[in-house]
Protein backbone atom coordinates (compact mmCIF):
# COMPACT_ATOMS: atom_id res chain seq x y z
CA UNK A 1 0.00 0.00 0.00
CA UNK A 2 1.61 3.24 -1.13
CA UNK A 3 0.60 6.88 -0.77
CA UNK A 4 2.51 10.15 -0.65
CA UNK A 5 3.69 10.45 2.95
CA UNK A 6 2.77 7.08 4.51
CA UNK A 7 0.92 8.69 7.40
CA UNK A 8 -2.74 8.90 6.29
CA UNK A 9 -4.03 6.62 3.53
CA UNK A 10 -1.50 3.81 3.19
CA UNK A 11 -1.26 3.09 6.94
CA UNK A 12 -5.05 2.76 6.99
CA UNK A 13 -4.92 0.45 3.97
CA UNK A 14 -2.17 -1.66 5.54
CA UNK A 15 -4.07 -1.97 8.81
CA UNK A 16 -7.43 -2.73 7.22
CA UNK A 17 -6.11 -5.35 4.78
CA UNK A 18 -3.92 -7.01 7.43
CA UNK A 19 -6.91 -7.16 9.79
CA UNK A 20 -9.15 -8.71 7.14
CA UNK A 21 -6.48 -11.18 6.02
CA UNK A 22 -6.01 -12.36 9.60
CA UNK A 23 -9.77 -12.72 10.04
CA UNK A 24 -9.84 -14.84 6.87
CA UNK A 25 -6.99 -17.03 8.16
CA UNK A 26 -4.53 -15.74 5.58
CA UNK A 27 -0.86 -15.34 6.44
CA UNK A 28 -0.25 -12.34 4.21
CA UNK A 29 2.55 -9.85 4.69
CA UNK A 30 0.98 -6.42 4.28
CA UNK A 31 3.10 -3.27 4.42
CA UNK A 32 2.86 0.38 3.47
CA UNK A 33 5.18 3.13 2.30
CA UNK A 34 5.20 6.67 0.98
CA UNK A 35 6.83 8.06 -2.13
CA UNK A 36 8.42 10.92 -0.21
CA UNK A 37 10.50 10.72 2.93
CA UNK A 38 9.05 13.72 4.76
CA UNK A 39 7.54 11.63 7.53
CA UNK A 40 10.01 8.73 7.75
CA UNK A 41 9.90 7.29 11.25
CA UNK A 42 6.62 8.99 12.18
CA UNK A 43 3.50 7.22 13.41
CA UNK A 44 0.33 7.43 11.32
CA UNK A 45 -1.61 10.70 11.51
CA UNK A 46 -3.66 10.93 14.70
CA UNK A 47 -6.95 11.01 12.75
CA UNK A 48 -6.01 7.91 10.75
CA UNK A 49 -5.26 6.18 14.05
CA UNK A 50 -8.53 7.41 15.59
CA UNK A 51 -10.70 6.30 12.67
CA UNK A 52 -9.00 2.89 12.48
CA UNK A 53 -9.44 2.35 16.21
CA UNK A 54 -13.15 3.17 15.93
CA UNK A 55 -13.30 0.08 13.71
CA UNK A 56 -11.23 -2.08 16.04
CA UNK A 57 -7.96 -1.72 14.13
CA UNK A 58 -4.86 -0.43 15.91
CA UNK A 59 -2.33 1.13 13.52
CA UNK A 60 -0.40 3.07 16.18
CA UNK A 61 2.59 0.68 15.92
CA UNK A 62 3.19 1.51 12.26
CA UNK A 63 6.14 3.67 11.29
CA UNK A 64 6.32 5.70 8.07
CA UNK A 65 8.95 4.70 5.55
CA UNK A 66 9.83 5.61 2.00
CA UNK A 67 8.99 3.38 -0.96
CA UNK A 68 12.09 1.81 -2.54
CA UNK A 69 12.92 -0.15 -5.68
CA UNK A 70 13.35 -3.23 -3.46
CA UNK A 71 9.60 -3.11 -2.71
CA UNK A 72 8.95 -3.96 -6.36
CA UNK A 73 10.83 -7.23 -5.91
CA UNK A 74 9.64 -8.05 -2.40
CA UNK A 75 5.87 -7.81 -2.87
CA UNK A 76 3.54 -9.76 -5.17
CA UNK A 77 1.04 -6.91 -5.43
CA UNK A 78 1.43 -3.19 -4.76
CA UNK A 79 -1.56 -0.89 -4.46
CA UNK A 80 -1.21 2.86 -4.89
CA UNK A 81 -3.68 5.38 -3.55
CA UNK A 82 -3.43 7.74 -6.55
CA UNK A 83 -2.15 8.03 -10.13
CA UNK A 84 0.54 10.55 -9.16
CA UNK A 85 1.80 8.04 -6.58
CA UNK A 86 2.25 5.43 -9.33
CA UNK A 87 4.18 7.98 -11.40
CA UNK A 88 6.51 8.65 -8.48
CA UNK A 89 6.90 4.91 -7.77
CA UNK A 90 7.94 4.44 -11.39
CA UNK A 91 10.51 7.24 -11.02
CA UNK A 92 11.93 5.80 -7.79
CA UNK A 93 12.07 2.15 -8.91
CA UNK A 94 13.21 2.82 -12.51
CA UNK A 95 14.22 -0.53 -14.06
CA UNK A 96 12.79 -2.49 -11.11
CA UNK A 97 9.28 -1.07 -11.59
CA UNK A 98 6.93 -3.92 -12.55
CA UNK A 99 3.66 -2.55 -13.89
CA UNK A 100 2.06 -6.02 -13.66
CA UNK A 101 2.32 -5.83 -9.85
CA UNK A 102 1.08 -2.24 -9.44
CA UNK A 103 -2.48 -0.93 -9.58
CA UNK A 104 -4.65 1.70 -8.01
CA UNK A 105 -6.39 0.31 -4.94
CA UNK A 106 -9.81 1.49 -6.09
CA UNK A 107 -9.49 -0.51 -9.33
CA UNK A 108 -10.19 -3.58 -7.18
CA UNK A 109 -13.65 -2.18 -6.53
CA UNK A 110 -14.18 -0.27 -9.78
CA UNK A 111 -12.01 -2.00 -12.42
CA UNK A 112 -10.54 0.37 -14.99
CA UNK A 113 -12.07 3.51 -13.44
CA UNK A 114 -8.66 4.68 -12.13
CA UNK A 115 -10.15 6.43 -9.11
CA UNK A 116 -7.85 7.95 -6.52
CA UNK A 117 -8.31 7.61 -2.78
CA UNK A 118 -8.32 11.31 -1.81
CA UNK A 119 -5.61 12.52 0.55
CA UNK A 120 -7.27 13.65 3.80
CA UNK A 121 -4.11 15.46 4.96
CA UNK A 122 -4.91 18.99 6.23
CA UNK A 123 -8.61 18.21 6.11
CA UNK A 124 -11.16 17.69 8.88
CA UNK A 125 -12.00 14.35 10.47
CA UNK A 126 -14.92 13.46 8.14
CA UNK A 127 -12.39 13.13 5.29
CA UNK A 128 -10.61 10.38 7.20
CA UNK A 129 -13.91 8.52 7.68
CA UNK A 130 -14.57 8.78 3.93
CA UNK A 131 -11.09 7.43 3.15
CA UNK A 132 -11.55 4.58 5.63
CA UNK A 133 -14.85 3.61 3.97
CA UNK A 134 -13.31 3.63 0.49
CA UNK A 135 -10.33 1.53 1.58
CA UNK A 136 -12.56 -0.81 3.58
CA UNK A 137 -14.70 -1.53 0.52
CA UNK A 138 -11.69 -1.99 -1.77
CA UNK A 139 -10.00 -4.38 0.66
CA UNK A 140 -13.22 -6.40 0.89
CA UNK A 141 -12.97 -6.78 -2.88
CA UNK A 142 -9.35 -7.97 -2.56
CA UNK A 143 -10.24 -10.60 0.05
CA UNK A 144 -13.30 -11.76 -1.96
CA UNK A 145 -11.29 -11.92 -5.19
CA UNK A 146 -8.59 -13.98 -3.49
CA UNK A 147 -11.17 -16.34 -1.95
CA UNK A 148 -12.79 -16.79 -5.36
CA UNK A 149 -9.45 -17.50 -7.05
CA UNK A 150 -8.49 -19.92 -4.28
CA UNK A 151 -11.77 -21.83 -4.61
CA UNK A 152 -11.05 -22.31 -8.33
CA UNK A 153 -7.40 -23.19 -7.72
CA UNK A 154 -6.65 -24.86 -4.36
CA UNK A 155 -2.91 -24.72 -5.18
CA UNK A 156 -2.90 -21.01 -4.34
CA UNK A 157 -1.13 -20.50 -1.03
CA UNK A 158 -2.53 -18.71 1.98
Task: Identify the residue ranges that each predicted region occupies.
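Conserved active-site segments centered on acidic
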Residues: 1-74, 144-153, 157
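Phosphate-binding/catalytic loops
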Residues: 77, 83-158
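Short beta-strand scaffold positions
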Residues: 1, 80-81
Amino acid sequence: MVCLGNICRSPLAEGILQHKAQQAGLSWSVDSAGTNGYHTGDAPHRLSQKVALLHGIDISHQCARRFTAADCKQFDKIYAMAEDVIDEMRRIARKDFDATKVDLLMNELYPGKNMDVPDPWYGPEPGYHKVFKMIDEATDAIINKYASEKSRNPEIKK
